[in-house]
UniProtKB/Swiss-Prot annotation:
Sequence similarity: Belongs to the GcvT family.
Name under which the protein is recorded: Aminomethyltransferase
Catalysis: reaction(s): N(6)-[(R)-S(8)-aminomethyldihydrolipoyl]-L-lysyl-[protein] + (6S)-5,6,7,8-tetrahydrofolate = N(6)-[(R)-dihydrolipoyl]-L-lysyl-[protein] + (6R)-5,10-methylene-5,6,7,8-tetrahydrofolate + NH4(+)
Species of the source: Prochlorococcus marinus (strain MIT 9215)
InterPro entries assigned to the protein according to its UniProt record, in alphabetical order: GCS_T, GCS_T_bac, GCST_C, GCV_T_N, GcvT/YgfZ/DmdA, GcvT/YgfZ_C, TrmE/GcvT_dom1
Domain of life from the UniProt record: Bacteria
A GO BP entry: glycine decarboxylation via glycine cleavage system
Gene: gcvT
Amino acid sequence: MDLLKSPLYSKYVESNAKLVNFAGWEMPISFSGLIKEHESVRSSAGLFDISHMGVISIKGINPKDYIQKLFPTNLYSFSEGQGLYTVMLNDKGGIIDDLIIYDLGIQENDLSELLLIVNASRYEEDFQWIKNNLNMSEISITNFKKDKVLLALQGKNSFDLFEEWIESSISYIPTFGCEYKIFEHISPKEKIFFSKTGYTGENGLEILLSKKAAINLWDFSISKNVTPCGLGARDTLRLEAGMHLYGQDINEETSPYEAGLGWLVHLENNHEFFGRRFLEEQSRLGIQKKLVGLSIEGKAIGRKGCAVLKGEENIGTITSGSWSPTKQQAIAFAYINTTHALINNEVQISIRGKKFKGVITKRAFYKKNY
């Protein structure tokens, strides 16, 4: 089966990017090197093509009413022009996907529209789960992205750069805010969607636009010395920022409480949602494992599947691990037995048959200081 390609694939080739298969897409893992790309985002700005991600449109009269049962988070906690990070759960409280829902307000035919930005590896599962569990006579669900491009402009300079490109201020838009509008000088007939969101721990924007407009933004960014970045730097940046990767840190066997995402579960809202009974029980009785951060001595990297030990006892398993260019140390996430999941608890990590000292930390290793 041929790999899917982004509309900006030719830009990868021009840049001699190193390409890999990611969730059925041929995507750049790096352009100029992971460390350089990572540091560019931390110090100034980087540009990512994230067109592999899925974008689902849900339209209807009050569509939040119909999709609320798919989510443990109160969908009326955000309104038009805002986004909400949440999780979609199965009937046992396991995480089908983590995603962002955006409220676009009233669009065509006086119908309200929601956009769901979902993980590439989960798009088909998400789409079918939504269709199978909703009354499709009341709402419509479509692939919103089609041949559009999804870009992420990330870093402390990203807002200034984007304002220069659109020739307009975005200072009034809050974090997780979004807009869907036409910029006449860029494309007089095309609405561009953008949001103040990202996966790096920095200020950033995620932008959905046509191929022509995307090439315009790409070329503009490169002319301003913005570093094109691949999925490798995206992974190290999100790990430093304490953000989950679906399929590694969360899956259908992990619950929001175990993953440190209990704040997304609004039991007090009293709405019915898939997995509610299971999560009520976890809330009452507690959990057996918990996702934590790990700082590891030396330069050995704890990868997915490495055991975490306390003495001779196996107390957990690493889900994600990398060298942190910012912290200059090996870092990881791991699910640890809750009795041992204490901040500053010293543990050992088994890496290729050798034991390395580690310390349990908060999951976020980096926080921006501006």
